[in-house]
UniProtKB/Swiss-Prot annotation:
Pfam families: fn3
Subcellular location: Membrane
Signal peptide from the UniProt entry: 1-22
Extracellular domain ranges by topology: 23-194
Gene Ontology, cellular component aspect: membrane
Protein name in the entry: LRRN4 C-terminal-like protein
Cytoplasmic side: 216-238
Topology with respect to the bilayer: Single-pass type I membrane protein
Species classification: Eukaryota, Metazoa, Chordata, Craniata, Vertebrata
Superkingdom of this protein's organism: Eukaryota
Underlying gene: LRRN4CL
InterPro entries tied to this protein: FN3_dom (IPR003961), FN3_sf (IPR036116), Ig-like_fold (IPR013783)
């Protein structure tokens, strides 16, 4: 009699507890299909925020490493070849201070550093100091008012340096300089202060000449008398 309640309890648990059903292969395929449908598509790669004309521009490879998402860099030539020539940009001349600010754009080549070449009418060019690869702007000092110069920017890497136009017998003054090449002609205007001083000097000289002419005229008049009065006296005597 004591075993009857236990037997009834076992029978109730056996029939009331739901039995686990084995998963069929079709169920696994449905789960995999659901996961595939909910997967996000890969984001399209966008160009990196790189401007080859921007001053102090961070290299594009560094932008790819630190960026929040993948980006694309412009194609570059082989580092085993010398860089292509940079492209000269805007040149601002300050005649009063005797200086000029030169701007350029980097070539699509690996570059380690830049430097400037300046011709002032002589065959030998003045070479500036090396500039960092992120630099796109440099300053020229000591320019003479009214002078004509030719400035070129050179890019260099381990394989060599970029090309510049060939200099003629008088430097680059008579060379054919392309419009979008690495060189540009600088025509420094005369210093405005020099023009003012020259105008004041010319005006002073004219004033002195006028005064000298008047003094000379009155001296001759006092010495020889007025020609008109002498003619009038002669006519009256007749």
């Amino acid at each position: 009699m004591l075993g009857s309640p236990c037997l009834l309890w076992l029978l109730a648990v056996t029939f009331l507890v739901p039995r686990a059903q084995p998963l069929a292969p079709q169920d696994f395929e449905e789960e995999e299909a659901d996961e595939t449908e909910t997967a996000w598509p890969p984001l399209p790669a966008v160009p990196c925020d790189y401007d080859h004309c921007r001053h102090l521009q961070v290299p594009c490879k560094e932008l790819q490493r630190v960026g929040p998402a993948a980006c694309l860099c412009p194609g570059l030539s082989s580092p085993a070849q010398p860089p292509d020539p940079p492209r000269m940009g805007e040149v601002r001349i300050a005649a009063e201070e005797g200086r000029a600010v030169v701007h350029w754009c980097a070539p699509f080549s690996p570059v380690l550093h830049y430097w400037l070449l300046l011709w002032d009418g002589s065959e030998a060019a003045q070479k500036g100091p090396p500039l960092n690869a992120t630099v796109r702007r440099a300053e020229l000092k000591g320019l003479k008012p009214g002078g004509i110069y030719v400035v070129c920017v050179v890019a260099a890497n381990e394989a060599g340096a970029s090309r510049v136009p060939q200099a003629g017998g008088e430097g680059l003054e008579g060379a054919d300089i392309p419009a979008f090449g690495p060189c540009s002609r600088l025509a420094v205007p005369p210093n405005p202060r020099t023009l003012v001083h020259a105008a004041v000097g010319v005006g002073t000289a004219l004033a002195l000449l006028s005064c000298a002419a008047l003094v000379w005229h009155f001296c001759l008049r006092d010495r020889w008398g007025c020609p008109r009065r002498a003619a009038a006296r002669a006519a009256g005597a007749l």
